[in-house]
Amino acid sequence: MHSFYSHVKLGDNLYRERNGVDFEDLEPGMVFQHRPGRTVYQTENALHSLYTLNQAAIHYDACYAASTEFGKPLIVTTLTLSIVMAMSTKTFGRVCANLGMKEVRMPAPVFDGDTLYSESEVLEKRLSNSRPGNGVLTIHTRGLNQKGVTVCEYTRTLLLYLRGHEPYAAAAY
């Protein structure tokens, strides 16, 4: 059983919040539940539609959405994906770069007032062949609603700093 700390002791009675789990402490098979959850609202959904030029009426026209099989506006999939991914940044905060995503699925709709949670499983890890001081981590993340229904999932590959190679000390992290 691994135990991760949330703060680093800097001196007598002085602690600093930590950002992410070290690459060296991650192992395939570990599952991280990301908290807190995040409730999604129609206001941000309509704004996201406008910001991203998503003109699908099902996201912001309640009268149109009422005539569909869903009966109400759907939360934009890219907003759902963004929220679910952002939830994992606290755990995987020692990331140097996102290398890619694949197998993105949106198996169930998200609606105004739904609360999203996410969890990530470590699938594999290895040292980077091209970037000394970095490791490559592959995770599978699922976004779930308040009923435990999977609404989003994807596999993501990240480049993480190894201990002693990160820029955090210089930035007072």
Labelled PLM ranges:
Residues 101-145:
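Hydrophobic beta-sheet segments that form the core/acyl-binding groove
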Residues 2-100, 152, 163-173:
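Hot-dog-fold acyl-thioester-processing enzymes
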Residues 138-144, 149-167:
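Flexible glycine-rich active-site/ligand-binding loops centered on an Asp-His dyad
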